Amino acid sequence: MLKIVKLKMNYQENPIGVTQVPQFGWVLESDKRSVIQASYELQIRADAELKNVLFDSGEMISDESAHVFAEGFQIKSAEKYFVRAKVTDGDGECSGWSETGYFVTALLSEEEWKAEFVSAESKENAGESKGTYVRSSFRVKGNVKAAYAFTTALGLYKFYINGKKVGTDELTPGWTSYLKHLTYQTYDITTMLKEGENGVGAMLGAGWYKGKMGFVGNRNNYGEQTAFLGQIHIAYEDGTTDTIVTDSTWKGSDAPVVFSEIYDGEIYDARLEIEGWAEAGFKAERFWDVETVAFDKKVLEAQSFSKVTEVEPVTAKRIFQTPQGDTVIDFGQNMTGWIHVKVKGKAGDKVELNCFEVLDAKGNVYLDNLRGAKETLTYICKDDQETEYHPNFTFMGFQFAKIASYPGEAKIEDFTAYAVHSDMEQTGTFTCSNQDINQLQHNILWGLKGNFVDVPTDCPQRNERLGWTGDAQIFCRTASYLMNTYHFFAKWLKDVAADQTPEGGVPHVVPDILSGKTDGDWLLEQGSHSAAAWADVAVINPWTMYLTYGDKKILEDQYSSMKAWIGFMEEHAKDYIWNYKLQFG
């Protein structure tokens, strides 16, 4: 029996946030050998009942099951399109229609943005790393056919409708060259709305945008205040529409995240929680007027791909005492992510966990490799009810956690770690009869997971965690055997292009938070960039993506960047010898 088992659009199943007609592809399954596709038919429809056909390819004589295009089809903003396909093999057997998939479009033009970035902070808060709330309410006037939210932030954010978090992604919108390239997210909130008043809000954290970054420790690399951008499109059954936007009517407040930094961890004081802050009917007397923040919306790009998520839980393996008397949790696996903590105490009781990677030779806590990073999770109880907490706007590289403070007896079942990284489908595995080689492969895979948190980093634990271009260039091919990295690298390569110098030079790290930060420093001074092998990422990575996936689009998107880098080398390679300023190794 011939059938389509995976219908994909842009290498994804049911993507949300598409801004161009996607590429289509599928996986065939058959009980026969040597099956070759002879033809396909692709349909796009406007409704789940598949009555309103918008596009029908007819039978196309082709063995292509990837990079299939719906030639001539045009999409509209904030719409859901339903897709199905069928194929016929060389023996004339037809698969029948696949299960119906879908894709949802984002906003297709800058002009459609009516929202403004809003902030509960002012520039006087530039030195602070606390969390804030922004909120509003709106009315739903009838039966909702579909509702989509388009959101992003300067900083990190969590988005809420009627008191419930929207989406499963974390550390959103991730790390980009914010002032030149910022992703926004699309959410289907149709089932979260109710007729009448609805509450909407976001909690914001400093993140990569204004937090302390790099081994130099500079903060406010992109701006001095966090801000949220949100726009909701509602389509009613009667054909009318509504648009809800962030603007100066929104209100702001401090959040219970009293401190949050990428390197140092988070302090969350549950006593400061504001009940119902993102729900309908909330009285915001203690909230203040937000500030609107100017930002160029031309740099916004819809993200339908590789969002950071909690990917897998890792249970604690043991709790033990070190020779120095510290109580330590061992999760049995070095990972990047955070810890879910269950705790029952009284108001003011504190949980404090210091995360770290290894024990020293004597079996004690070892922190030297963290350098200046603290990697500390702190939770302060608000009452005597059992609760569960995990950090909002930070992540750690760890296998162990020292229990510096915990009310009562710490039980192993109270602690569960979660690996957190960009969501990518695993596409390659390797096992053999040699357990040492198997362990090496295991370490490579977990090393990939730990260093693919929105950008390809050098490490996940110390006060660095930067997108070193040389590391990404060297590991790109291996990573692409193990995971579907197409969207992960395509997104990051846009920041490579964005951060190139006007002449075409490539920074040592992308996003570039190092260049020009310290006068006279051999590594950081302005003009220190474009090292051999590191800067070659501008050409090698797009080419590797093309060789791996056969998709010319990434070459089209990156061509100007690739050409600029080659031109830069030609300009500065005297007598064809490349020795431009700083070279590593």
What feature does the model see in each segment?
Residues 511-517, 526-544, 548-550:
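Charged, long alpha-helical assembly modules
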Residues 438-441, 445, 486-497, 539, ...:
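Hydrophobic core segments within long, regular secondary-structure runs in both alpha-
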Residues 449, 501, 547-550, 567-574:
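Sec-exported extracytoplasmic/periplasmic mature domains
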Residues 167, 201-202, 467, 540, ...:
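Structural recognition of the beta-strand scaffold that forms the well-ordered cores
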Residues 202, 465, 469-472, 531-539:
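Short alpha-helical patches at coil-to-helix transitions and adjacent helical residues
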Residues 406, 474-485, 538-554:
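Well-ordered alpha-helical scaffold segments within catalytic/enzyme domains
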Residues 2-80, 84-462, 470-471, 487-490, ...:
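Extracellular/oxidizing-compartment recognition motifs
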